[in-house]
């Protein structure tokens, strides 16, 4: 996609004098122009393969898949629309093999097992080496330094392992016990191809996060009319990476690590008041672990924070649904109420970091 759609925006005009200097007329933000985006092309190519077997004595399903992809993305703006780039871009590729195994009646009757595993190795190259400054008309002037935002030609290697285990044990038709465990391991190493440093991170310090989430649940379904379930989860996350010791959050990085853990739980139930009308009620003491970009940024337009706490929330949901079928036709309606009480909420803001012209999305 060229993404060359129109935007309505003001323009930072400039004039180049005969001596080569640049004059900037007063900026009039009341004048809005209808202009095309000109540096926002994106393309992605992928090769995907999958092979497996089903219906074997030792496996009901075993599948191995492979995914290789390449992408190229031009960067039109910073985190603000009035910061315009004309040559900044990023590119990269990723390799992802994965495995899935499913077996019913494992060792004993009514014990089902699902295992999945995948490995993702991707490389991203952020390039900002132009010595030009652009406006929304695509006009430019030569600057005295390189880098439209921040001079860089950096390479980030991300290695990500993920695995899941899920076991279901059925006792008769009414009772089901489920145990699940999800593990992930992420490591990012970065380097500057041109030998430049970054104000927003330390290339020499690896970024590492490891997550483990274990869950146990019980479901009672004595009839098609109603069911209830209860569950508990344990969360654990280890993070390690560069943390700035400066008051403005820029430079003077040291390698710090932290470990957080939490315990969540909840219950849910459904009940048919009559044949076509169902009510659902659920409550969860939930936790959301920070993502890799929230922890470490994207090495370009986003800055992360290694010492983030998990989001915690009390979630209450109540919904009603009506589903009526008559002949080839059907009527479905649903209404619900949602209550959320969230603490340690992770949000992104916009900031000018380190007193520079570089604006970033920050946690």
Segments predicted by a language model, with ranges:
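Outer-membrane beta-barrel translocator domains and adjoining extracellular loop/strand segments
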Residues: 5-13, 74-83, 125-134, 189-198, ...
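Short, solvent-exposed loop/linker segments at the N-terminal edge
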Residues: 207, 309-311
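Membrane-embedded beta-barrel scaffold of Gram-negative outer-membrane proteins
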Residues: 270-284, 288-290, 311-361
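Short beta-strand or tight-loop elements
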Residues: 265, 304, 314-316
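Extracytoplasmic loops and strand-loop junctions of Gram-negative outer membrane beta-barrel proteins
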Residues: 27-35, 79-85, 96-97, 143-151, ...
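Face-selective signature of the C-terminal outer-membrane beta-barrel domain
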Residues: 48-71, 90-249, 254-274, 280-284, ...
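Periplasmic-side early beta-strands and strand-to-turn transitions of outer-membrane beta-barrels
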Residues: 1-80
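Short, intrinsically disordered, charge-balanced linker/junction segments flanking boundaries
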Residues: 1-12, 173-174, 335, 352-363
């Amino acid at each position: 996609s060229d993404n060359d759609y129109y935007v309505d925006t003001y323009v930072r005009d400039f004039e180049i004098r005969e001596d080569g200097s640049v004059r900037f007329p007063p900026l009039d933000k009341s004048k809005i122009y209808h202009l095309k985006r000109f540096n926002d092309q994106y393309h992605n190519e992928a090769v995907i393969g999958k092979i497996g077997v089903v219906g074997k004595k030792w496996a009901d399903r075993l599948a191995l898949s492979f995914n290789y992809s390449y992408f190229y993305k031009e960067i039109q703006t910073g985190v603000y629309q009035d910061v315009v780039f004309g040559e900044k871009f990023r590119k990269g590729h990723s390799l992802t093999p994965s495995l899935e195994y499913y077996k019913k009646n494992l060792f004993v009757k009514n014990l089902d097992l699902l295992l999945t595993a995948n490995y993702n190795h991707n490389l991203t190259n952020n390039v900002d080496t132009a010595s030009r400054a652009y406006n929304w008309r695509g006009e430019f002037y030569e600057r005295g330094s390189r880098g439209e935002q921040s001079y860089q030609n950096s390479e980030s290697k991300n290695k990500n392992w993920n695995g899941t285990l899920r076991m279901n044990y059925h006792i008769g038709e009414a009772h089901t016990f489920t145990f699940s465990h999800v593990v992930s391991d992420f490591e990012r190493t970065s380097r500057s191809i041109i030998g430049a440093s970054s104000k927003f991170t330390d290339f020499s310090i690896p970024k590492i996060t490891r997550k483990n989430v274990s869950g146990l649940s019980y479901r009672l379904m004595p009839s098609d009319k109603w069911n209830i379930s209860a569950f508990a989860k344990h969360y654990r996350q280890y993070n390690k990476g560069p943390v700035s010791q400066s008051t403005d959050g820029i430079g003077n990085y040291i390698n710090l690590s932290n470990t957080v853990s939490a315990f969540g739980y909840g219950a849910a139930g459904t009940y048919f008041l009559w044949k076509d009308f169902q009510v659902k009620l659920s409550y969860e003491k939930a936790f959301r672990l920070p993502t890799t970009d929230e922890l470490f940024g994207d090495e370009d337009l986003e800055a992360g924070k290694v010492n983030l706490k998990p989001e915690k929330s009390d979630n209450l949901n109540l919904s009603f649904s009506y589903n009526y079928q008559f002949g080839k036709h059907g009527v479905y309606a649903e209404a619900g109420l949602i209550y959320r009480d969230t603490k340690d909420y992770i949000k992104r803001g916009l900031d000018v970091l380190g007193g520079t012209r570089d604006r970033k999305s920050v946690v």
